[in-house]
């Protein structure tokens, strides 16, 4: 059975309940892992990311309900209010797994974290892009890409609730799909 490391995200807990902090992963990841016959290994610690990368078969960097701070991709000072540990852990894991030539899948903010970890930037705030009032929107899949192999090139409906996006694409990365905005 393959072992896939997966990042967890911290649930927003009121300051009045500091001992109630929780970390989570969405049910979709659990169902998919079950269907694929893989074991998910939840990661919370910065301890020995190199050993972790050597022992696991891949990494999933999940999305987050917080913005990736500008300092993470070299465009601003460190913001004390940002979840630094979360994004530093993402970067450490991404670089270690990539260094081991292990597959890394970034989903939502996880993909944005991958782009930034390898030298790309982000668009900090997408206006009018909190599409919680609809399930999908049109996205154009580029030809001759992995995504085109799954869905075919052209326009497809995908869900997207992002308020940030890749800006400058990291060296060695390629855009596989685009939204009109």
Language model region names:
Residues 1-105, 118, 123, 127-155, ...:
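N-terminal beta1-alpha1 cap of cysteine-dependent amidohydrolase-like domains
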Residues 108:
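Conserved G/P- and acidic residue-centered "switch" motifs that form tight phosphate/ATP-binding loops
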Residues 111-114:
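Hydrophobic, aromatic-enriched interface-forming segments
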